């Protein structure tokens, strides 16, 4: 439980502190999502419920698809602008 909280807080801090780099923001979102998945997995193992484990596998698959789509959008963004940095005005 404490490990998942620490991982989630690391993800939030990474997202907040790296507001100019889209890749690091995407990685931070993935860390937060995997922390929640790990919490669901550990909780389902503690109560001996297979439904939580299958739900964790489902979350991991969706996170992989999300990462692939996000990186594809980033490649298109890089080709268009030449950089993946966000410029605030």
From Swiss-Prot:
Its EC number is 7.1.1.2. Pfam families: Oxidored_q2 (PF00420). One of its GO terms (biological process) is ATP synthesis coupled electron transport. Its main location: mitochondrion. It is a multi-pass membrane protein. Signal peptide: none annotated. One of its GO terms (cellular component) is NADH dehydrogenase complex. The keyword Transmembrane applies. It is found in: Mitochondrion membrane. It catalyses: a ubiquinone + NADH + 5 H(+)(in) = a ubiquinol + NAD(+) + 4 H(+)(out). Keywords: Electron transport, Membrane, Mitochondrion, NAD, Respiratory chain, Translocase, Transmembrane, Transmembrane helix, Transport, Ubiquinone. It is an enzyme of class 7 (translocase). InterPro entries: NADH_UbQ_OxRdtase_chain4L/K, NUOK/Mnh_C1-like. One of its GO terms (molecular function) is NADH dehydrogenase (ubiquinone) activity. The keyword Electron transport applies. The chain crosses the membrane at residues 1-21, 22-42, 57-77. Core subunit of the mitochondrial membrane respiratory chain NADH dehydrogenase (Complex I) that is believed to belong to the minimal assembly required for catalysis. Complex I functions in the transfer of electrons from NADH to the respiratory chain. The immediate electron acceptor for the enzyme is believed to be ubiquinone. Belongs to the complex I subunit 4L family. This is NADH-ubiquinone oxidoreductase chain 4L. The gene is ND4L.
